[in-house]
């Protein structure tokens, strides 16, 4: 059922994209500007850094990343996008995975994708897929349960697929994050951590060419079962100057409740001249060709109780709240 849901969400981004007629119309001047752009002049490698504060199942992090065109044609591009992030400890008393504090780690993410423009360049469509990893170091808990001396590291991984459609007014993004390998691991004597399957659809509107507001729906599911259910999210992003984008996010689901996070992305390179970079910044449909794909984190949650105590380094099962031997 979940796999069918993910396929449906991915198809919806392409199916819904042609609906907004206002973005299709455009003025003759707008169409002339976009048709005159040579993609080989503006679709160039970019590299830089990014950072984010913790959200629903995602860590405090900062790192480097880059977008690398593999092949650029008149109206399309094949690309590779890669990220490496260092993770930092959770805010005191505020676990990013619900109960256990994340003490650090790092992550990697790669996406291979294809993006193309329609005939009059009023829409950009894209498909990408990739692989993400997330080793985790753990600390204490926010629940008062003493786990000192039993903290463990864990390693989670996932495959991801994404479909996108962008005009100069609207953007649609559908995605599926699917954990693979050992998706459920012990974090300490009491809590287990699990990577979440996540399937979502975001719909955004460009208030201006550099300000985008979006809302989204997601469904999450994990082997532990404690975080299963639906959620909603909102995002406001502002490209302050070419290559520098800041965003604020708010999400809600029953497991993580309300989470507010923020992120910053800086990229250097891109279009050949300053004038071209400014022109591209005012045309979201062209700017999207070199944008970094979203939804790159392996989302993790935890759960505890008598049902998980048997995995206790060979010790006897413990009652809820008991300390280790």
Regions inferred by a protein language model and the residue ranges of each:
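Repeated loop/turn-to-beta-strand initiation elements of outer-membrane beta-barrel proteins
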Residues: 73-80, 119-127, 169-174, 209-215, ...
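Residues that define the transmembrane beta-barrel architecture of outer-membrane proteins
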Residues: 58-64, 102-108, 123, 155-159, ...
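Transmembrane beta-strands of outer-membrane beta-barrel pores
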Residues: 51-57, 70, 84-90, 116, ...
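Detector for outer-membrane/organellar transmembrane beta-barrel domains
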Residues: 148-224
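Residues on the lipid-exposed face of transmembrane beta-strands in outer-membrane beta-barrel proteins
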Residues: 64-68, 110-114, 161-167, 201-205, ...
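Flexible, glycine-rich linker and terminal segments associated
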Residues: 24-35, 185-195, 200, 205, ...
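Short glycine/proline- and aromatic-enriched beta-strand/turn motifs that initiate or cap beta-hairpins
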Residues: 21-81, 85-94, 307-323
